[in-house]
Amino acid sequence: MKDRVSITMLDGGIADVRLIRTDKMNALDAAMWAALVEAIETLKATPGLRVVVLSGEGRAFCAGLDLSSLQAERDPGASSAGGTLADRTNGIANNAQYAAWGWRELPVPVIAAVHGVAFGAGS
């Protein structure tokens, strides 16, 4: 998770969650979705959590889907850190779906601190 998403706990139960794939303007790939799911699960189990602030490192919040990662997934023999889009990894949802939906399951407000680019799945 640490190469795609970081969580820093601040005073007062504030979780600072950051997308950290600046070379691709925080574009989403299978590893990013898996890291977001892991972050959500970590936050669910964090005692004293009061609020989550989600932001992106660098000059963009999130450039949306990393299309090159989809091409790599189609290549025979390619392995993907977060599974394929077809894999149901979270009940009836895949990691990409749960990375978006899971924030709703947190019992605290989630604030998106959007700056710069925010396209498609990143908006």
Please describe what each predicted stretch is.
Residues 1-57, 73:
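Conserved CoA-thioester-binding segment of acyl-CoA-metabolizing enzymes
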Residues 20, 65, 115:
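Histidine-centered beta-alpha loop that forms part of the nucleotide-sugar donor binding/catalytic region
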Residues 27, 62, 121:
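Residues that form or flank phosphate/diphosphate-binding pockets in enzymes
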Residues 56-102, 118:
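Glycine- (often His-adjacent) and acidic-residue-rich active-site loop
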